[in-house]
C-alpha cells in the first residue's frame, strides 16, 4: 500500500486539474498501466484511438502537475523571504516566540538588546539560503 501512495496521490491531483476527460476513464488507464505490480500476468494494451487520446490527455496532466509543483516552490521562496526574513528584519512581534532568548531579564533594556540581536540573527539566518540560491543561479 505504501508503494501506491505517491502515484495514486499524484494521479488524483492531476485529475483534479483535468477537465477534458472523466475520472473513470483516467482511473481505468492508470490501473491497467500499474497492474503489473500486483500480478505476474502481463496485459497487452490495445492501441485504439480512444487509448491514444487518453494518453495525450495524461501528458497534459503531467505538465499541469509540473506547473503546480513549480508554483509550490516559488511560493516557498516567497514565504521564506517575505514572511520570515522580512518580518524578522522589522522585529515583528508575532515572531517573538521563535527567538532563542531567555524568558527572564533583569531590566527592559536587557530584553530589548537580546531581542534585537536575536531578531537580526534570525533574519540573516533565514535570508542567507535565499541569497545563496539567487547568486548561485547567476
Swiss-Prot record:
Compartments it resides in: Membrane
Protein name: Ribonuclease kappa-A
Signal peptide (UniProt feature, chain positions): 1-24
Its job: Endoribonuclease.
Lineage of the organism: Eukaryota, Metazoa, Ecdysozoa, Arthropoda, Hexapoda
Transmembrane segments: 76-96
Source species, domain of life: Eukaryota
Organism: Ceratitis capitata (Mediterranean fruit fly)
Membrane topology: Single-pass type I membrane protein
GO cellular component, one term: membrane
Extracellular face residues: 25-75
Keyword annotations of the record: Endonuclease, Hydrolase, Membrane, Nuclease, Signal, Transmembrane, Transmembrane helix
Molecular functions (GO terms): RNA endonuclease activity
Topological region Cytoplasmic: 97-138
Entry EC number(s): 3.1.-.-
Family: Belongs to the RNase K family.
Amino acid at each position: 500500500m505504501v508503494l501506491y501512495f505517491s502515484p495514486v496521490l499524484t494521479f488524483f491531483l492531476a485529475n483534479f486539474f483535468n477537465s477534458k476527460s472523466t475520472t473513470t476513464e483516467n482511473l481505468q488507464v492508470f490501473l491497467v498501466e500499474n497492474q503489473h505490480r500486483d500480478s505476474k500476468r502481463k496485459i497487452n494494451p490495445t492501441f485504439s484511438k480512444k487509448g491514444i487520446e487518453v494518453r495525450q490527455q495524461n501528458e497534459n496532466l503531467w505538465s499541469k502537475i509540473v506547473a503546480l509543483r513549480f508554483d509550490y516552490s516559488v511560493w516557498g521562496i516567497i514565504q521564506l523571504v517575505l514572511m520570515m526574513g522580512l518580518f524578522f528584519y522589522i522585529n515583528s512581534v508575532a515572531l517573538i516566540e521563535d527567538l532563542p532568548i531567555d524568558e527572564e531579564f533583569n531590566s527592559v533594556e536587557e530584553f530589548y538588546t537580546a531581542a534585537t540581536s536575536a531578531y537580526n540573527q534570525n533574519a540573516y539566518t533565514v535570508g542567507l539560503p535565499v541569497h545563496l540560491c539567487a547568486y548561485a543561479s547567476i
